Structure formats: C-alpha cells, structure tokens
Amino acid sequence: MKISYSLLVHNETDTLEKLLEFLVKYKQPQDEIVILDDYSDDEKTKIILDYYSSAEGVVLKQRNLLGDFATQKNYLKNMCSGDYSFNLDADEIVTHWFMKDIHEILNGNEVDLIFVPRINTVEGITEQHIRGWGWQVNEKGWINYPDWQGRIFRNRPNIRWEKPVHEQLIGFQTYAHLPMEQKYSIIHPKTIDRQVKQNQKYSEILR
C-alpha cells in the first residue's frame, strides 16, 4: 500500500519545515509527499520547498489558490499516486506512533474515509475569544476536541472536495474513526494572531 501525504502551502515557514522534516523521516519508503504551493513569496518558505523538492518521494507543483480551497485540494488530490491520500495542513503534524501504525490501520479497515481526531490549541486565547467563537475548551486546553477531520481517504475519482472554505469530502461510501487518543490525533497548534488572521481570510473569501 502507498500513502500520499498531501499538503497545501502558502508562506508557512517554521511549521512547514518541521512537518516536512518529520514526514521525510517517518514515512514508509513507498509513500510520497505531495505539495501544492500557492506561489509562496516568503524567501524562507521558498528555500524550504526548494530543499525538500529534491528529496526522494517528494512531488512539488505550484498553482494559484484563487480563493477556492476545494478546487485547490482536488487538484492536489489528482497529483497523488497513492492508494490513500492523507491531507494535512502545513501548520499541523502527527505523532511518530501515528506514522508507525497508519499502514496497519488502513490494511485493517477497508473503508473509503477515515476520520482523525484533531487537537487544537491556541496560544494567547482568552475567555472573551472562547465565548465569542463559541468554542469548547477541555482541561488540557484542547479546543473542540475531538474535532473530527475527514483527512485519510481512498484515491478515487468519485471522492473529492467541495465548498471553497471549510471544505468537505464527498463521494465516499464507507468510513471509520480513529481512536480518540493523543497518539492518533492531528496536532494543530496556533497563536491567537494567526487564528485571527485566518478568520479574516475566510471571511473575505466568503464575501
């Protein structure tokens, strides 16, 4: 089995470098890392992408986002040659336990889509933010956990993304959920400044 770890990128720097270093280290030899860059103009990001584009199993292309995440992700999906695609944001990461077990999990679950729990944390968040956005925060500081994300899916033409923002997968018939455990969760840390900027960007796209 081959997994395509697929990433949309635009000017992420420290988080992108950490993610790519991690994926190159822990992916299986037959797996690939597929990157679609929205013409990043940050110099450090361009250096990171240039460096990792020459690594074994890495595929890199550029395409304008044009305010439509679903179309961009569908283009990215079509770049993938794996049996399954695992879509990650450039500011997310998983654990080495996750990478160690994912092939066995997929071999044991003949489903089209796997939902993955996500641990969201926002550095600098206040009670005002939490109330204003209607978030739930547990005793560990995890926001809206398990925040299920449909991210691991069969690479088939009928399974595709829809909606320009807060995009979702359609076309799948069967699905499963990973255990609600930290080792099987997507880790998604942010700062409050990044969260506010992201909210503003999504609002502009939806206008």
Regions found by a protein language model. Give the residues of each.
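Cell-envelope/extracellular polymer assembly enzymes that use nucleotide-activated donors
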Residues: 2-4
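Short beta-strand/turn micro-motifs composed of small residues
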Residues: 7-9, 37
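Short, well-formed alpha-helical segments that are part of the catalytic scaffolds
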Residues: 11-26
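A short acidic, amphipathic alpha-helical/loop segment
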Residues: 18-22, 47-48, 75, 100-102
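A conserved acidic beta->alpha catalytic loop
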Residues: 22, 33-48, 65, 89-92
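Conserved beta-strand segments of alpha/beta enzyme cores
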Residues: 32, 57-60, 176
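Conserved donor nucleotide-binding strand/loop of the catalytic core
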Residues: 46-71, 79
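Catalytic-site signature of metal-activated, phosphate-bearing donor transferases
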Residues: 70-77, 84, 93-207
